């Protein structure tokens, strides 16, 4: 697309949004993704890298513009190919296992209207289960919506990042939400994805052995492959070498801490917690982790558990500032304070916190309230 024409379109004409997808064997997820784009994207460009299932048929039946593409083990190349095929003034890059959140249309319209020459960050919401049986949702910020200019392209074979060569282009938060289902893959599909990613990342790391971000991503992939000791080496190397202002470093810290907790390396946990608090003393996820780790390791320090959870609540939602697990500064902290007071038989305090958690939409708090009520009734009968 001619850049001068794109700038003119972006600024003076009605915005046109092209959604771009890179797909292979996505018949399971693609229908929901395309449905979420209906009435929002003016054009949908799908780059198929060799599907053998019904992906291409689904794409064609939904009126998308479909291109075959020979996969070159390079996600940035594939995404840039999609951008070249887009005719819109703006690009929304979305994966097949993602869906636009229901409230995103107005936010997209506002971004296109008020920030036509900016890079737009969206929140990717990824649900996952923890060992306590509860479902948590990780929230991370990624640039996915941007003007269709030749100065804006992707770099990196894997975990590619959008780069603008124009220093005047700013990045803004949009409030747009993408709901991610990628962790719902079958075991075999997840193993295949992990193997592919690890191969690409290791090739990149050979070229850039001191790239802290690559070490972080290798560590994440090794965790998924259950290679914990090797993952920890990459995490710790990334932590000490990442630049102070690196936006991914808080997420890297939390990934390291949760891995150490799984490995039950308590001494290392508290050393990295101290390191983290020196840098991120307003990060609710960090205090939430400390409280959960103290409880899990049965450390006899009830005042510290209480203080950490209360600090989470006083800090509140910091998802605009940090990559967060939803609720660490709100409903999850309230719920865990409920647990804290319940095990000490302080039932009125427990009830108040469970109720507050439920009022904020955390449905497991309802079962906790019912359980607590049964306990109270049983004690009264005695």
Each model region followed by its residue ranges:
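Conserved donor nucleotide-binding strand/loop of the catalytic core
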Residues: 42, 56-81, 85
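Catalytic-site signature of metal-activated, phosphate-bearing donor transferases
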Residues: 2-5, 77-83, 89, 94, ...
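Cell-envelope/extracellular polymer assembly enzymes that use nucleotide-activated donors
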Residues: 16-18
């Amino acid at each position: 697309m001619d850049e001068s024409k794109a700038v003119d379109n972006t600024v003076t004409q009605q915005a046109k949004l092209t959604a771009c997808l890179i797909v292979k064997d996505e018949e399971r997820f693609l229908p929901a993704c395309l449905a979420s784009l209906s009435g929002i994207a003016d054009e949908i460009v799908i780059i198929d890298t060799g599907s053998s299932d019904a992906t291409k048929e689904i794409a064609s039946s939904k009126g998308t513009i479909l291109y075959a593409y020979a996969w070159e083990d390079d996600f940035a190349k594939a995404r840039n190919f999609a951008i070249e095929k887009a005719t819109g003034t703006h690009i929304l890059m979305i994966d097949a296992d993602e869906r636009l959140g229901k409230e995103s249309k107005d936010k997209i319209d506002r971004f296109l209207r008020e920030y036509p020459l900016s890079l737009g960050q969206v929140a990717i919401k990824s649900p996952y289960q923890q060992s306590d049986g509860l479902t948590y949702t990780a929230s991370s910020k990624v640039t996915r919506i941007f003007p269709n200019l030749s100065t804006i392209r992707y770099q990196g074979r894997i975990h590619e990042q959008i780069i603008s060569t124009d220093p005047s282009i700013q990045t803004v938060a949009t409030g747009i939400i993408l709901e991610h289902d990628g962790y719902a893959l079958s075991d075999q599909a997840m193993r295949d994805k992990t193997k592919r990613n690890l191969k690409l990342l290791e090739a990149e790391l050979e070229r850039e052995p001191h790239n802290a971000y690559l070490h972080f991503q290798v560590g994440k992939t090794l965790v998924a492959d259950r290679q914990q000791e090797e993952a920890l080496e990459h995490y710790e190397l990334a932590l000490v070498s990442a630049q102070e202002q690196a936006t991914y470093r808080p997420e890297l810290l939390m990934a390291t801490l949760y891995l150490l907790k799984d490995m039950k390396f308590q001494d290392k946990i508290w050393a990295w917690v101290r390191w983290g608090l020196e840098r991120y003393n307003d990060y609710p996820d960090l205090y939430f982790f400390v409280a959960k780790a103290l409880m899990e390791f049965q450390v006899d320090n009830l005042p510290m558990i209480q203080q950490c959870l209360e600090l989470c609540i006083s800090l509140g939602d910091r998802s605009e500032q940090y990559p967060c697990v939803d609720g660490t500064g709100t409903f999850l902290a309230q719920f865990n304070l409920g647990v804290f007071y319940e095990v000490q038989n302080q039932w009125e305090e427990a009830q108040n916190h469970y109720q507050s958690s439920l009022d904020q939409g955390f449905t497991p708090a309802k079962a906790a309230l019912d359980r607590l009520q049964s306990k109270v009734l049983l004690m009264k009968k005695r």
